[in-house]
């Protein structure tokens, strides 16, 4: 069954409440690399129940309908779906424990052709309850590699689907003014999936091979959370309340065990960033990064 344009666009993909406790908040922080120095007070504020603080990027895993693409109504080939980019804007601090309400909907479904696949942009809003005060808004850009050509089917959306032009940030100029190096554990994806995305692409070697990878890859949002950690460390004294927004493009897969080198440029409250893997010939894995500080 081909991707169903009207099914995706006509209704929310999910509306759900997500209850979480201190253990979930701490497990997420461990999953994105905090705790490497267990004596660092800046890291411990996200790892100890007393006066616990939630990382802003924890919002990326809350009230999200993981494995939504398994629902046959959408006609999406989940095995060939890749996360291409993510943007998060915080409207209020995320509670360290409690409940949030999330609404996820497809705002763009674009047909790039049978050979190139389709592009899907999901928007998710988080609030403190249905119709409540907003906490965060985020967009997730997905490449549906197996779903191109859907608009050739009569009545399945406008020709080419929705128009979409990805925003392109100009590359930073000059050397970075801050560099943060963060390692990932070989078991990083296995830890992260306990509180986040259970997609077998990140845990099952056979599934990863079927998707075209030699082995399971690290979740894009795990690397994204590490980028947030790098910003907090470089500029904000590990103060989560001052990270207002962050967006990134996933340029290449990160593998568990990779060490990431984050390069950052700051102008006022605006930050540009990218990440490479030095041990893989300096491969660029996170690109076009932008953040807003408060």
Where are these regions (language model features)?
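HotDog/MaoC-like acyl-thioester-processing domains
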Residues: 1-14, 64, 83-179, 254-257, ...
């Amino acid at each position: 069954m081909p991707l169903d344009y009207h099914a995706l666009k006509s209704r929310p993909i999910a509306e759900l409440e997500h209850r979480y406790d201190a253990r979930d908040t701490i497990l997420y922080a461990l999953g994105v690399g905090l705790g490497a120095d267990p004596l660092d007070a800046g890291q411990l504020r996200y790892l100890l129940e007393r006066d616990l603080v939630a990382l802003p990027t924890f919002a990326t895993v809350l009230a999200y309908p993981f494995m939504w693409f398994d629902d046959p109504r959408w006609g999406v080939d989940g095995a060939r779906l890749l996360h291409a980019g993510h943007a998060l804007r915080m409207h209020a601090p995320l509670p360290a424990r409690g409940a949030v309400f999330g609404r996820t909907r497809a705002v763009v479904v674009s047909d790039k052709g049978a050979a190139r696949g389709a592009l899907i942009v999901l928007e998710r809003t988080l609030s403190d309850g249905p119709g409540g005060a907003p906490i965060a808004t985020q967009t997730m850009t997905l490449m549906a590699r197996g779903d191109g050509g859907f608009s050739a089917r009569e009545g399945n959306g406008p020709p080419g689907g929705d128009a979409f032009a990805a925003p392109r940030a100009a590359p930073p100029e000059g050397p970075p003014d801050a560099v943060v190096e963060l390692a990932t554990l070989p078991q990083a994806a296995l830890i992260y999936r306990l509180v986040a995305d259970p997609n077998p692409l990140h845990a099952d070697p056979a599934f990863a091979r079927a998707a075209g990878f030699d082995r399971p890859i690290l979740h894009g949002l795990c690397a994204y959370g590490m980028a947030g950690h790098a910003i907090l460390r470089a500029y904000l004294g590990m103060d989560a309340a001052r990270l207002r927004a962050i967006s990134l493009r996933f340029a290449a897969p990160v593998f568990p065990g990779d060490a990431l080198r984050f390069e950052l440029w700051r102008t006022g409250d605006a930050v540009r960033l990218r990440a490479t893997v030095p041990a893989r010939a300096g491969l660029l894995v996170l690109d076009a990064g932008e953040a807003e500080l408060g």
